Amino acid sequence: DEPMIWRYFVAPLPTKLAASQLDEREFVARFVIRINHTLDGAYIFSSGKNMGVFKANGFPEDVGEYYMLENYEAYSWTCHGRYPTNTPGWHPFALLDTTVVHNGEISSYDANRRFIEMFGYSCDLLTDTEVITYIIDYLGRKLGLTYPEISNVIAAPFWSTIEKQEPRERERLTYLRNAFASLMVTGPFSILVGYTGGLMALNDRLKLRSMVVGEKDETVYIASEECAIRVIAPELDKIWAPRGGEAVIVNLNDGGNK
């Protein structure tokens, strides 16, 4: 059966927003988390202004037909087409204009969850991927870290690697690892993060999950396997496998403003 989905285009009531003394994004984020935590039988899975999330249980071609994806245009797309084996939740997971798809299993989930829930988040959607979304939202939107800095928190370099850096870089990496130790993600994983104006791909430090990046003209393709890229773009200008813990960050020339 088709999923039961209601779509609304809304803005916070000005009086409620003013009374909350929050900015609009924080107001909406808190509302989404509250609904997902308190309302049984329903949840919000798409809450961005410039980000649409499409979820369903079925074959990819049927999902595309149901949502009429041929009518949409976007500068970036992320997709997760494999049903999870360890949890009943499935990807992508999103909050506001950030979305995450994930291949792997997070052994640090409980430690990450306990820490992030101290800051108003609530992990209720039954998958370890959800906590990565909240970690990125917390570090990026609330604390103002850049995506290279976020990658250094999530896939923090080994201490032996940090010690080999130049003094300034060593100091920076040491600070990030000490300050956000509870947000380091351990276990085998590869993630793809979509955000306004770009994408970030990241492997665990030991590269226990595969990830391949290809380029053709002005387009970048990222997948778990090269064959998935070749189906879409048989001829590539460049293809490579990023090292473990090495973030691949792709930004639009105009910053996603067009």
Enumerate the predicted regions with their spans.
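Conserved short alpha-helical segments that host acidic/polar catalytic motifs at enzyme active sites
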Residues: 1-258
